[in-house]
Design a protein with these regions (language model features):
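Thiol/disulfide oxidoreductase modules built on the thioredoxin-like
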Residues: 136-143, 150-203
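Short, conserved catalytic or interaction motifs in soluble domains
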Residues: 32-35, 102, 177
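N-terminal targeting signals for export/organelle localization
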Residues: 1-67, 205
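A short beta-strand-turn-helix
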Residues: 62, 67-88
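Short active-site neighborhood of thiol/selenol oxidoreductases, capturing the structured segment around
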Residues: 78-101, 107, 121
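Structural microenvironment flanking redox-active thiols in thiol-disulfide oxidoreductases
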Residues: 101-141, 153-158
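Active-site-proximal beta-strand/loop segments in catalytic clefts of secreted hydrolases
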Residues: 92-94, 124-127, 150-151, 186-187
Length: 205
């Protein structure tokens, strides 16, 4: 095969990769601000969805969360992996999202109740082109836990297909003490539902 004939193939592969990434980002946008969702993402059979819409994975079958690091809304460096040894609650949100606004006080209340018990909350703010909007949201709802600033949604694309990946905004994931994904919700959460997600993971030895 000549160099001339190889060039279009490389170009086609690059174009296919770009289209795949764009489609993944678009899928997240289309499901944004939904009040519910479905389990799945690649045919994973290791998790079970309960009647409350919360999906869980047994301890021996969990997948590690991807690298989730970067700058927070306040400009500080944060790496979720640094919280290994604690139960981590990840919440994907946007200031423009009505269900996110509804659940924000519930997240803050449970965070205040559990932060002394080795539970760390981390937000991932997405689709906010202006960081000032995200900061205003936190101020309005009294959110005190840190949030990574991810305006393009690139952190969400790091989750492997077939795991308990976030598929809507809001989404909430619970990571066990080893940094593995133990539970997921694709809807806004009440205090009770959030505790239902966290308590079994917190009780694990």
């Amino acid at each position: 095969m000549s160099a001339t004939s190889r060039t279009p193939l490389r170009s086609n592969r690059s174009r296919a990769t770009l289209l795949a990434a764009t489609a993944a980002a678009a899928a997240l946008t289309l499901s944004a601000c939904s009040s519910g969702g479905t389990s799945g993402g690649g045919g994973d059979t290791n998790f079970v969805m309960g009647k409350d819409g919360i999906s869980t994975v047994t301890k021996g079958e969990r997948t590690a969360a991807p690298d989730l690091s970067g700058k927070t809304i306040d400009g500080n460096a944060l790496d979720v992996a640094s919280f290994k040894g604690k139960v981590v609650v990840l919440n994907l949100w946007g200031s423009w999202c009505a269900p996110c606004r509804a659940e924000a006080p519930n997240l803050e209340k449970v965070y205040q109740d559990l932060k002394a018990k080795d539970v760390q909350f981390v937000g991932i703010n997405t689709r906010d082109a202006q960081v000032a909007n995200a900061r205003a949201f936190e101020k309005q709802y009294g959110v005190s836990f840190p949030s990574l600033y991810d305006p393009t949604g690139k952190l969400m694309l790091r989750f492997k297909k077939g795991t308990l990946n976030p598929q809507a905004i809001p989404s909430t994931l619970v990571l066990d003490r080893q940094g593995k994904i133990a539970a997921r919700s694709l809807a806004a959460l009440s205090e009770d539902k959030l505790r239902t997600m966290i308590d079994p993971v917190l009780a694990e030895k």
